[in-house]
Amino acid sequence: MRRGFGFALLGLLAAAVVAVSAGAKGRDDHHLQKIDHIVVIYEENHSFDNLYGGWEGVNGRANATAAQITQVNQAGTPFTCLKQLDVNLTSPPLAATCNDSTTATPFSSAFTNTLFDIGTFIPTSARTCPQPGVFAPNGLLPSAANLPGGCTRDIVHRFYQEQYQLNSGKQNRYTTGSDAAGLTQGFYDTKALPIYQYLHTKDHPSYVIADDFFQGAFGGSFLNHQWLISARAPTFTGPVNDGSANDLHSIIDANGFPNATYPFYHPTTTVKDSQLTQACGLPTTVAGFACGDFAVNTSQPAYQPFQPGTLPARQLPALHASNIGDELSAAGASWAWYSGGWNNAAGVIGGPGWTNGDGPTCTDPQTFAGAVYPNCPNAVFQFHHQAFNYFFNYRPGTFARQEHLRDEAEFVQLAQSSTDHTCNLKAVSFIKPVGLENEHPGYTSESEGSNHLVQLLKTIEGSSCARDTLVLVTYDEFGGQFDHVAPPGQGGALGAHDEWGPGTRVPALFLVPNSHDNFAVDHTQYDTTSILATIEHRYNLAPLSTRDAAVNDFSNVFNAKEAKKHDEGDQKKHESGDH
């Protein structure tokens, strides 16, 4: 069932694109109140420029200035070349055509200091993807033993590092602040993405690209999943604060940087890159950066499923703060978090998606090493993506856990079982694909994740739910990758912000029911907590924090106006009231 009218002819793609102005004019509750179902598909680790920067009509890569693109070293001097560490991008195997002497250690590279198309060097057909559970810190050379998809290595994406990389909105220290050096400047050909191709077929669903959408918090997946559901950084209660091995506080230098192992950054003092913020009130505490007992980098939960072998001292104590699930339940609105591989990981024997038999051992060959039946997580199941599993209210054995923490396979069943007159989806659904299907660099390919995303959208669109369901596809965080738009609070950029973020701009697209337009671009400023604001406004819930109280909700997505189409080759500057 389609939301709007499709293109009668593919040639009509050249017709006018619709757009929304950056300055939200207030909430359009009329449209929002007609939405009976909200679906949030939370993908992984890509910046907007990295993935959607070539979409027509958006503030994309063509709008980036040379000053933003050109990366500088720790001293502020522009690199001549981009050093690469991924084994498919180093020289050799690529011919060294660029020589750099801007740092203490000269190097040669095949890459000058600019953006580059990853697919030119690592095509989708390349068998560079690891088998589930294989860790390759600098990627894998093509081999029949690997999986296809054109995988790259992973790139660091952590709390203090990202703040350094943003450089007060200059956007020019992604490379210096990274463990992957020049890979930060890579991008994917937007028009080759499965999601792009799906949304450019005849009779595609009506959709909106939001090109001013920022990750809620600086850093990585763990923290941004917490901001997705609670709009706050979680507190680690009772941490050790004595400088011992069990002290999980970070130590940063005068620039706010916590790591001494990266190719181009050399700390000015002793540093420590750990789970928590820097401690407050110590001689080492650096003013101007978050301090305290806040968990900001990857932390394991107190409850199963957590990564096998995790030391108890490193597990985040159960959280008691309010979250969006609590508020929805109190209001009587149905909801669920659907995670790929959840029933295997949580030991829900026989539930949808269960693949481990009757015991006494985990029988799925792709089970995480060291797993003990019945907790049989997939080898690339990401424990820190299970945001509600950190909360006391959803601990094992509770009705709330059984009712609301579900397997992605069940979401598909509900959509497919919906009738012409009844949509079986919950009022609010969060979907978190398993690692092999979530687009995260390092352990899966962009194409594999994008294909899975298309299948999810087709499942929703093929059901009666499409007529009253607002679908949002967005990404938890930037994955360490460059974007040219300064987040709110960086270098004077306007918008809601605080010491936690928001961070780098990320892709976001909506499928909009009953739209009169095939395609719109919304230039309104959003961040991850706009998801919360939208749910809160739709169901008359109180804000969870000052951030979700201040940001725009998605009402403006429905307010499209005609705008001139301009694609990646159009150098006309993006016009927006917030830039």
Residue ranges and their predicted role:
Residues 23-579:
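N-terminal pro-sequences and low-complexity stem/linker regions of secreted or lumenal proteins
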Residues 19-21:
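N-terminal signal peptide c-region/cleavage motif recognized by signal peptidases
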Residues 7-17:
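Bacterial N-terminal signal peptides
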